[in-house]
Amino acid sequence: MVDKRESYTKEDLLASGRGELFGTKGPQLPAPNMLMMDRVVKMTETGGNFDKGYVEAELDINPDLWFFGCHFIGDPVMPGCLGLDAMWQLVGFYLGWLGGEGKGRALGVGEVKFTGQVLPTAKKVTYRIHFKRIVNRRLIMGLADGEVLVDGRLIYTASDLKVGLFQDTSAF
C-alpha cells in the first residue's frame, strides 16, 4: 500500500531514494546531491490551476550547497536546470504517490522561462506543480505546469512537464 500523506519530511524523501517509500516497484527520487527538495509541504489529488492535483515542495538555501562552489566561481548561482529537474522529480514523486509503479523518466517540457535566479543569499526555494493530466494505462505519465519561487518571488515557469513510469528502461 502506498504511503499517501499530504506532506513528507527530508527523511521520507531520502527513503524514497532508497526505494522504501512507495515500495520496491514504485518510482524513486534521486539521492543527494541530485535530490532538489528538503520537504514536500502539500500534495493533493485535486487543486492546482487545473483542479487535477497539486504538489508544493521546498528547498532550504545556504551558501554551502554543492552547486554554488562550481557554478560559477566568483559568481555563484543555482543552475536553472536543477530547478527544472526538481519539477520533474516532483511529477514522478506524485505518480508514485498515486500508486504508479515503474522507473521514472523525464519525457520533456513544453516551454521554460527564467525571470530570476537563486543566489547563495536566498533562504528558500518553493516548487509548485499544477497537474493537467494523468495517464494511467500501459504507460503511466504525468503532465503538469510548474513554478519555481525564491523567497516568495516567481523566477521560473515551465509548461507541459512530462514524466513517465516505465517497467523496463532498456529500450528507452
UniProtKB/Swiss-Prot annotation:
The keyword Lipid metabolism applies. The lineage of its organism: Bacteria, Pseudomonadati, Pseudomonadota, Gammaproteobacteria, Enterobacterales. Necessary for the introduction of cis unsaturation into fatty acids. Catalyzes the dehydration of (3R)-3-hydroxydecanoyl-ACP to E-(2)-decenoyl-ACP and then its isomerization to Z-(3)-decenoyl-ACP. Can catalyze the dehydratase reaction for beta-hydroxyacyl-ACPs with saturated chain lengths up to 16:0, being most active on intermediate chain length. Its main location: cytoplasm. It is found in: Cytoplasm. InterPro entries: FabA (IPR010083), FabA_FabZ (IPR013114), HotDog_dom_sf (IPR029069). It catalyses: a (3R)-hydroxyacyl-[ACP] = a (2E)-enoyl-[ACP] + H2O; (3R)-hydroxydecanoyl-[ACP] = (2E)-decenoyl-[ACP] + H2O; (2E)-decenoyl-[ACP] = (3Z)-decenoyl-[ACP]. Belongs to the thioester dehydratase family. FabA subfamily. This is 3-hydroxydecanoyl-[acyl-carrier-protein] dehydratase. It comes from Escherichia coli (strain SE11). Homodimer.
